[in-house]
Swiss-Prot record:
RNA-binding listed as a keyword: yes
Region feature Disordered, mapped onto this chain: 185-205
Name by which UniProt lists this protein: Large ribosomal subunit protein bL25
Keywords of the record: Ribonucleoprotein, Ribosomal protein, RNA-binding, rRNA-binding
Organism listed in the record: Cupriavidus taiwanensis (strain DSM 17343 / BCRC 17206 / CCUG 44338 / CIP 107171 / LMG 19424 / R1) (Ralstonia taiwanensis (strain LMG 19424))
A Pfam family per the record: Ribosomal_L25p
Keyword Cell wall biogenesis/degradation carried by entry: no
GO molecular function: 5S rRNA binding; structural constituent of ribosome
Gene Ontology cellular component list: cytosolic large ribosomal subunit
Length: 205
């Protein structure tokens, strides 16, 4: 995914405000052997790019002054109540160095899972992304979670997923976290309990 930016020579609160008023967003690219570089981007193009999932979890081709660098989106700051991107950070990546990135999960075959189709349950997404470690060339845009065989009451764990080649999940202490489950809707559980209580009542003499 290509991102076009321009070198920025001035900094400070006043300069950033003037930049935003002209339809630009200040930013920075850092990391690697090169020095951090101040940049500016077209605000509207950046705003639309931020709505794309791939912009957050892909290696970007960041073009600055005609030169292209591989980079990751690392952070962005939004205005508290206006639809305005205040600042954006990119990190350079090297083809030979592993990176840590959060990758979104795509849940597949939810409607056809036995626990949903036959058991009338709901699929619960316990996590929606996973932090992974891999080389830039191995970074997936997303990881598939196939829940098509899940039964009512079943939980899918990390060990049940088929990870792309070269990708390792960073679990931060929990070696096999839960990813998804299928359970009955809360209302259905309450109705079933009430029905059981009513059936067990003995009419007064």
């Amino acid at each position: 995914m290509k991102v076009v930016a321009f070198e920025r020579s001035v900094q400070g609160t006043g300069a950033s405000r003037r930049l935003r008023n002209s339809g630009k967003t200040p930013g920075i690219i850092y990391g690697g052997a090169a020095e951090p570089k101040m940049i500016e981007l077209d605000h509207n193009a950046l705003w639309h790019a931020l709505k794309k999932e791939a912009f957050h979890s892909s290696i970007l081709d960041l073009e600055v002054a005609g030169k292209s660098e591989k980079a990751l989106l690392r952070a962005f700051q939004m205005h508290p109540f206006k639809p305005l991107v205040l600042h954006v950070d990119f990190q350079r990546v090297s083809a030979n160095d592993k990176i840590h990135v959060k990758v979104p999960l795509h849940f597949m075959n939810q409607e056809t899972a036995p626990g949903v189709k036959l058991g009338h349950g709901l699929v619960n997404h316990i996590v929606n992304d996973l932090e992974v470690s891999c080389l830039p060339a191995d970074l997936p845009e997303f990881i598939e979670v196939d829940v098509g065989a899940m039964e009512l009451g079943q939980t899918l764990h990390l060990s049940d997923l088929k990870l792309p080649k070269g990708v390792t999940v960073i679990t931060h202490g929990d070696d096999n976290p839960a990813i998804a489950s299928i359970s009955q809707p809360a209302g259905a559980v309450s109705e079933a309990a009430e029905g059981g209580e009513a059936a067990g009542e003995t009419p007064a003499a």
